[in-house]
Regions:
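Substrate-binding N-lobe of the ribokinase-like
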Residues: 16, 25-91, 95-99, 106-111, ...
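Short, glycine/acidic-enriched loop or turn micro-motifs at the edges of active sites
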Residues: 24, 59, 163-165, 189, ...
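A short acidic, helix-capping loop that chelates divalent metal ions and anchors anionic groups
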Residues: 26-27, 191-194, 297
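Short, well-ordered alpha-helices that flank and scaffold nucleotide-derived cofactor binding pockets
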Residues: 42, 46, 68, 148-151, ...
């Protein structure tokens, strides 16, 4: 490709700062790097945005693995703090009756994100969007760091709720919704959040509308797995996307929600019409379900989407 076709795209890279956990799923035979913010950041990097993770790891081999992988992917590591006293986040994965059982370990390095360092990174990056979830809010140090992070960033806030039992509560959800512009949740999470705020509307759409109005959100997106997704916006407009055509066998659904969120962020930053962004997000999430794990190992996976979407 001629250089003059590449250079404008490089200059137009948009900064997205993602706050939260980087962790490793520890299987009996291997470890796999993940965490929702990290998976979203990987996708944004592959689609030629400039994601910066604000997270914290231990001074250990998993940190070395993470930094090597981020370097391989061309990702910025400036926001990855190092903790001498706590390990890199881990999720223990065990096989039980033919399925996986996940245990998210407590008191990990990402529970101790340093607010001052996060502040310096955020102010230097000047993001066009920020992303956060609930898991990294389970401890006071990271919760305070997130509060400072959100106060620093004057751009839109994307809250990907990702409730992980037992690491969430009504207080965390309320505080997060109050600081958000765009919120993504699945249909089960919608029921949980609606119950927190005594919303007894008869349909999911009316529950979503009540949440959107109560917290003055711009968009509330609800994913429904194989049945697609829908949203409601501040103008009370609703959009639905049909189930994506599954062209390959479903291998697992790990990371499908992260893939969906990443493409919605891309769409918002590139001013795609929301029905287009929803359809593309659903299409990409379905493709992720056709591979093992939450993100592809090879960049070639992204090329057909970049070509189709003119990225």
């Amino acid at each position: 490709m001629p250089l003059d076709n590449v250079q404008p795209k490089r200059l137009a890279k948009k900064n997205v700062v993602l706050f939260g956990e980087v962790l490793a799923d520890i299987f009996p035979d291997q470890s796999v790097l993940g965490g929702a913010p990290f998976n979203v950041a990987r996708h944004l990097q592959a689609f030629d945005l400039h994601p910066v993770m604000i997270s914290r790891t231990g001074h250990d081999l998993l940190r070395d693995d993470l930094l090597r992988e981020m370097d391989r992917l061309g990702m910025d590591t400036i926001g990855i703090q190092c903790d001498q006293n706590h390990p890199t986040g881990q999720v223990q994965v065990e096989m039980e009756n033919g399925s996986h059982r996940f245990t998210i370990l407590p008191d990990q390095a990402y529970d101790h994100i340093h607010a001052g360092i996060a502040h310096m990174i955020t102010m230097s990056i000047k993001p066009e969007m920020v992303y956060f979830g609930t898991l990294a809010q389970r401890s006071m140090p990271s919760r305070l760091a997130l509060d400072k992070f959100l106060s620093d960033s004057k751009c839109p806030h994307f809250f990907d709720i990702n409730l992980r039992h037992p690491w969430y509560n009504k207080h965390t959800v309320r505080r997060s919704l109050m600081r958000s512009d765009i919120v993504k949740m699945n249909e089960d999470e919608l029921e949980i959040v609606a119950s927190y705020f005594k919303i007894n509307a008869p349909t999911p759409l009316l529950k979503a509308k009540a949440l959107l109005d109560q917290f003055e959100l711009k968009y509330l997106l609800v994913t429904c797995g194989e049945h697609g997704a829908w949203l409601i916006n501040q103008k009370n407009e609703t959009y639905n996307t049909d189930p994506a055509t599954q062209t390959q066998t479903i291998v697992d659904t790990v990371g499908a929600g992260d893939a969906f969120a990443a493409v919605i962020i891309i769409g918002l930053l590139h001013d795609w019409a929301m029905p287009v962004a929803m359809q593309r997000a659903n299409q990409f999430a379905a493709a992720i379900c056709g591979i093992r794990g939450g993100a592809p190992q090879q960049h070639e996976f992204y090329i057909p989407f970049k070509q189709a979407w003119n990225l």
